[in-house]
């Protein structure tokens, strides 16, 4: 029983709490309605006061005054309406003028934009033609330089070939002279020690002549390279054309000087006259060496050729 009574008490308390909430909400609604009614009463009271003030004013004035005032207000209102119509007309005219001006401005702007547009195709073609012209000028310059270098190289090669041919001719002449001296010198006297030296020098002359030809070809190639470098420097730095011309002239004249220097004297062999008998040497085993018949060792041709081979690279 106690449990049931406690449960009933709790349920009753809940019902009472819900009823209290409902009553609170109802009281709030009643308060709001009372405030609205109060405001309505205040407005009615204000309206009543306004009506009473208007009645007092109307009672103090006659109907003629009221009519005059109404007519005056009508005139004012008609003037105001007329001004409004004029203002509307002015506004419409202004809008039409502004629309016409904006239309002209748009047309002018569009025409300017169309006129000022770049033709990318024409610009690209113009730049390509400019590049082609520049490349053509460079090619012409390179062709001129190459032509000049080729002409200089041809001149150097011709001079080198001429020098080599002259040296070969001189070498053949020296060989012939040496052969003649050997033939006609050995028939009247026996072979001496100086003849052996002469034969060895003739062999050395043959070998050194070939070496000198190789050295001359190498020196010609070095001169050709130096001429090419001088031509390139002449066209790359236009401030020193006189110096380059001087160096090329010196290189061109170098083989000519060497040519004149390589002319070796002919070998002369003196033989004993037929009436004179050769003197005996100290050991009495053969004829003595004739000092006048020995060729001068300092005037051989291989020394001059070696000197030329050493002088040519130095220049």
Swiss-Prot record:
Domain of life: Eukaryota
Family statement drawn from the similarity comment of this UniProt entry: Belongs to the SIKE family.
UniProtKB keywords: Coiled coil
Coiled-coil region: 32-99, 156-183
Name of protein: FGFR1 oncogene partner 2 homolog
Chain segments carrying region Disordered: 201-222, 238-315
A Gene Ontology biological process term: negative regulation of hippo signaling
Pfam families per UniProt: SIKE (PF05769)
GO cellular component terms given for this protein: FAR/SIN/STRIPAK complex
Biased composition (Polar residues): 246-269
Organism: Drosophila melanogaster (Fruit fly)
């Amino acid at each position: 029983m106690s449990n049931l009574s406690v449960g009933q008490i709790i349920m009753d308390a809940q019902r009472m709490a819900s009823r209290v909430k409902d009553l609170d909400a109802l009281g709030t609604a009643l308060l709001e309605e009372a405030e609205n009614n109060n405001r309505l009463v205040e407005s009615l009271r204000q309206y009543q006061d306004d009506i009473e003030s208007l009645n007092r004013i109307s009672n103090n004035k006659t109907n003629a005054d009221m009519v005059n005032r109404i007519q005056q207000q009508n005139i004012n209102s008609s003037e105001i309406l007329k001004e409004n119509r004029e203002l509307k007309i002015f506004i419409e005219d202004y809008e039409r003028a502004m629309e016409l001006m904006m239309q002209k401005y748009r047309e002018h702007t569009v025409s300017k934009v169309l006129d000022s547009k770049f033709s990318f195709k024409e610009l690209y073609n113009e730049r390509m033609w400019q590049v082609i012209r520049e490349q053509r000028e460079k090619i012409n310059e390179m062709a001129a330089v190459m032509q000049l270098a080729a002409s200089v190289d041809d001149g150097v090669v011709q001079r080198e070939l001429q020098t080599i041919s002259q040296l070969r001719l001189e070498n053949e002449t020296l060989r012939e002279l040496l052969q003649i001296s050997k033939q006609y010198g050995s028939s009247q006297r026996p072979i001496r020690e100086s003849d052996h030296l002469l034969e060895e020098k003739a062999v050395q002359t043959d070998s050194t002549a070939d070496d000198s030809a190789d050295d001359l070809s190498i020196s010609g190639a070095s001169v050709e390279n130096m001429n090419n470098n001088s031509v390139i420097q002449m066209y790359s730095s236009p401030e020193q054309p006189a110096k380059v011309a001087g160096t090329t002239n010196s290189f061109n004249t170098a083989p000519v000087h060497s040519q004149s220097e390589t002319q070796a004297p002919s070998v002369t062999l003196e033989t004993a006259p037929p009436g004179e008998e050769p003197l005996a040497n100290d050991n009495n085993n053969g004829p003595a060496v004739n000092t006048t018949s020995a060729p001068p060792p300092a005037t051989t041709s291989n020394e001059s050729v070696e000197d030329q081979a050493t002088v040519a690279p130095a220049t």
